[in-house]
Amino acid sequence: MLEARLSQTLLLKKIVDALKEIIAQGTLDCSENGLELQSMDNSHVSLVALSLASDCFEKFHCDRNVSLGLDLKSLGKVLKCANSDDAVTIKAVDRPEKITLSFESDGKERTADYELKLLNLDQDHMEIPKKDYTCFIQLPSSEFARICRDMSMFDESLTIACSSKGIRFLAKGDLGTANIQLSAGTAMDVSIEVQEPVTQSFAGRYLNTFTKATPLADRVKLYLSDERPLLVEYPIEDYGHIRYYLAPKVNDPDF
């Protein structure tokens, strides 16, 4: 049986909002250690991975591993029925066909219970190779969201180039060229670690969708290496993260 309680529904709303634009459905794997979800988008270009430790919850009990097939858009609709400061408790029995979400207002003056049917999803759990990246960038998540938004006005592709001089974002299109460069420093709160220079191009619409996770974290981490997917990580305080993996485009433009 699973029982997990959060003191505020807001966190769960933010997580679902960060997932549902990439994947419509996903399997939430529950264990005594917490919750995990991993799934690819329909185009098999991007992979999203959620990890949330049991310590994140006000109360957490899972006496047997259980997998919950979720329709994320439907879950998002149920969460809209709750105020952001309501407490939420998620319950599921062994071999469940549904989950129960119970919302309580502060002071328990209002309670509401909703049942959500589960899906029978046949999803393979992909093993992500644990290899070191040659470039690591950390910057404010709001700045990354702004860059992705601004670049999308110029072209559907966004080129990221990382070197010892800093990190550059470039988009070229019919409208013209957009070129933004960031250097490591305290004023912009940007940190950059480079072992080898990397230049890769990515589909801008995916990067823009990744920034739906901005409300979850003040800072975002970018990891790049040649011939490897880009890793965009949003830490969820000290309790976990959402990670997005995005395959680079085959032909990078001259930079």
UniProtKB/Swiss-Prot annotation:
Likely to be an auxiliary protein of DNA polymerase delta complex and is probably involved in the control of DNA replication and repair by increasing the polymerase's processibility. May function independently of PCNA during DNA repair. This is Proliferating cell nuclear antigen 2. GO terms for cellular component: chromosome; cytoplasm; nucleus; PCNA complex. PROSITE patterns: PCNA_1. It is found in: Nucleus; Chromosome; Cytoplasm. GO terms for biological process: DNA damage response; leading strand elongation; mismatch repair; regulation of DNA replication; response to hydrogen peroxide; response to methyl methanesulfonate; translesion synthesis. GO terms for molecular function: chromatin binding; DNA binding; DNA polymerase binding; DNA polymerase processivity factor activity.
